[in-house]
Amino acid sequence: MIELPVSIPTPDGTADGYLYRHESSRPLAGIVHLTDIHGVRDASRGMARRLAEEGYTVLLPNVFYRTRNPPMFDFPVNFGEERTKQRFAELTQPLTPEAIARDATAYVDFLRREKSVGSGAMGVVGYCFTGALALRIAAARPDVIVAAASFHGGGLHTDAPTSPDLLLPEVKAQVHFGHAFEDRSMPAEAIAKFDEALAAWGGRYESLVYDQARHGWTVPDSAAYNRDEAERAYANMTALFARTLGGSAS
């Protein structure tokens, strides 16, 4: 597996990140792998590398490039403390729906320019805060994104006029949403409303509550990491990508 640091040009600046390229000489489907709120680090690099080993070219962008380069938190993270809340706001506020749409095209176009990427369909996966970003990217580039996955994604349904689920009519991808059974950012009531939106949409989807999982369960360096449920989530994600993109998992 080849890991390359990359600079991704966007209309709003340059996003740093990594590209994971299989040693195979044939072009492979591209996947955009979005990190959780903690950004690009050893854990997320390992997750992206593992996915690439399934037979894909994977782009791991620093989605918070407008604010800072890694690490996202240069102090102990405690979401009950003001400085953590302030940093969270600094990282997320620039990611407006319009900014995410611009980034979507930048990431897709970057992958398309890579010789290791085929000219066809792509996928996207997001975790935590970026679960909603994965949905927004699928809506922004329905011409390319045929598979989207989200794990412990927060705020997929809100009462705001910019709620991510309102974009479902724009999405042509098959989607998988994995929810935690205990998640303040996506409580049971919000999951129920989100499932109603998915059913009304009429596309091909999976929306599952991982019964033994808390928010952050898929990420190896998370305090909530649950190996068994993380492996279940990984199997569901790779099955989605195998159905839609091929890869060695097919």
Residue spans of the language-model regions?
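N-terminal cap/leader regions of alpha/beta-hydrolase-fold enzymes
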Residues: 1-250
